[in-house]
């Protein structure tokens, strides 16, 4: 079996790039362009739904039944103590943070020059995004409330989370842009690697997760604005690394993982009860 590592020790010449464009079919080019968006939706599903499952399992371990859905969990925690509520609330963000660190480490140390690297990068972005967003108006915010934090403390943590999330997305945008084909123009590279996942991917993700309560739709759409910093980062990317990235259309492993992720989401649409 041929190794995944690309055989490109140097940047392709302009004539080779032009030949690549002429030789590539329309379907291939479309697959290259939409791959980041598809993998963003896949990474979101593989992060968000297990994240909610961790909340449900934590509640169950603490003695509370719950119903797990594709994007939220409904624990029977009316009798829970503040400490138990905090444990349930922070379990998901801790899980996502660990997944993000592992994914980014694997990306940097092993997969950054393999086709599967783009999925690991998207996986890390989404996994970091979830706990930071939760510090603004999500799980961490709820945990602080259960712990009796003052409004000033919660506001300060939200400000820090906004700064961290904006900075993270800026640099991730620069990294994502390196996955654009070298024959793409700057605008095409930005569109396929950051603007596409943000604008098209968010809509697709919402459609995949339907039906969901209305109170979840607006926050997901609003929180996606931090992708604007990824777009800005991509715009400022020097694009000195594209020759080191294996440019691919959608691969069979991509499609398999995407199908598995979507199946997992749809299986939870009607809820799974974890009862004592």
Where are these regions (language model features)?
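Hydrophobic transmembrane alpha-helices and their immediate loop junctions
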Residues: 2-276
């Amino acid at each position: 079996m041929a190794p995944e590592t690309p055989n490109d020790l140097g940047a392709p010449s302009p004539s080779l790039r032009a030949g690549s464009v002429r030789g590539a079919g329309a379907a291939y080019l479309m697959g290259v362009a939409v791959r980041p968006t598809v993998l963003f939706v896949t990474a979101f599903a593989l992060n968000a739904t297990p994240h909610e499952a961790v909340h449900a399992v934590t509640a169950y371990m603490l003695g509370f039944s719950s119903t797990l859905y594709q994007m939220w969990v409904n624990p029977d925690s009316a009798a829970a103590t503040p400490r138990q509520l905090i444990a349930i609330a922070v379990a998901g963000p801790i899980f996502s943070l660990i997944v993000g660190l592992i994914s980014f480490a694997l990306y940097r140390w092993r997969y950054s020059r393999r086709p599967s690297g783009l999925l690991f990068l998207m996986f890390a972005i989404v996994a970091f995004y979830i706990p930071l967003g939760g510090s603004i108006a999500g799980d961490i915010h709820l945990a602080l409330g259960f712990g009796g934090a003052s409004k000033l403390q919660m506001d300060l943590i939200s400000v820090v989370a906004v700064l961290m999330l904006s900075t993270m997305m800026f640099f991730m945008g620069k990294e994502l842009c390196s996955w654009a084909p070298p024959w793409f123009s700057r605008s095409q590279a930005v569109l396929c690697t950051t603007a596409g996942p943000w604008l098209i991917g968010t809509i697709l993700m919402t459609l995949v997760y339907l039906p969901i309560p209305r109170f979840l739709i607006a926050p997901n759409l609003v929180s996606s604005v931090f992708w604007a910093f990824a777009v800005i980062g991509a715009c400022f990317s020097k694009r000195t690394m594209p020759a080191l990235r294996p440019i691919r259309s959608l691969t069979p492993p991509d499609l398999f993982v995407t199908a598995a992720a979507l199946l997992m989401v749809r299986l939870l649409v009607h809820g799974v009860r974890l009862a004592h």
